[in-house]
Amino acid sequence: MSDGLCNGISFNVSEGHGPNYIVGRYKLGFVQQGILFLDPYECLYLYFKGRITFEDSEESALKKLFSITSVERYTAYTLLKNKGYRVHEDNGTIFFRKSTEIPRSVVVVREYDEIDVGKFFTERPDFYFTVDEEGDATIYRIDEIDIKGTENNKIGKCSVTDFGDRHFTKDDLPHWMGTKFHEYRMLTDFEANLIEGKEPKGMAEEVYRDLLSRGCIVKTGFKYGTNFRVYEGEKSEHAEYLVSVVENKLIWYYISRAVRVASSVRKKMIFTTIIDGKIKYIMISRSKDIVI
């Protein structure tokens, strides 16, 4: 008679221990009529720790278990379990806690998964966990952020002249607006539209205006692969933020790349979109560890 069952897979507890030892030592599964019942994550965890053995084919058992779970979610489960958390999975989300604390959540994504950015604001877990195709794991944290600057950006209407497809002005502007071009200041499309009093066109231009209204200095983020680089004020020696405007969905690979670039230049990576008519900002950062 086998010691335990997991989704129809029979197994035995190793080293002469019984089912109650597993429940007491590892806080996994439950015992009913002398049989240890495990969920697929618990079963994989104990198997790879050498605490249980399968009665039938190892390969067929592992194929069945990983078809229910995934290598990526199992990796996240193991990381959390080894840190002493109580861990369980529910509908693709992994929850973990210590003792009676409120559970925290982890969603596991692969590098080429498509992400609905709107869910960062409505269904955001505490952490995202990725395992790349080489098996390396990275932890991400996502926090909604209220960006605020120190500038009084009341910019009056000015005259703009076009030379070719570029915009220029000789009028007085904040020194950070535009780029000096001989006796003119060369303006971006967004800057020119603003000082001419035109309505914004598209989400990116709405975000540009919103950041200005928050007292920030806003410049192009092109060389970083983002829409904007944002300074909290004139006293800022370097931009504090890189901001990417997202219409709908993103491949996680793009998010990961953007976060890495921002981190390498000591800036915070911000993604923004419009939810129910309001501009929202989230900061995505890499975390060295899952800490609660």
From Swiss-Prot:
GO terms for biological process: tRNA splicing, via endonucleolytic cleavage and ligation. InterPro entries: tRNA_endonuc-like_dom_sf, tRNA_intron_Endo_cat-like_sf, tRNA_intron_Endonuc_cat-like, tRNA_splic, tRNA_splic_arch_long. It catalyses: pretRNA = a 3'-half-tRNA molecule with a 5'-OH end + a 5'-half-tRNA molecule with a 2',3'-cyclic phosphate end + an intron with a 2',3'-cyclic phosphate and a 5'-hydroxyl terminus. Gene3D superfamilies: 3.40.1350.10, 3.40.1350.150. The keyword Manganese does not apply. This is tRNA-splicing endonuclease. PANTHER family: TRNA-SPLICING ENDONUCLEASE SUBUNIT SEN2 (PTHR21227:SF0). The gene is endA. The active site is at Y231, H238, K267. Endonuclease that removes tRNA introns. Cleaves pre-tRNA at the 5'- and 3'-splice sites to release the intron. The products are an intron and two tRNA half-molecules bearing 2',3' cyclic phosphate and 5'-OH termini. Recognizes a pseudosymmetric substrate in which 2 bulged loops of 3 bases are separated by a stem of 4 bp. Homodimer. Belongs to the tRNA-intron endonuclease family. Archaeal long subfamily. Keywords: Lyase, tRNA processing. It is an enzyme of class 4 (lyase).
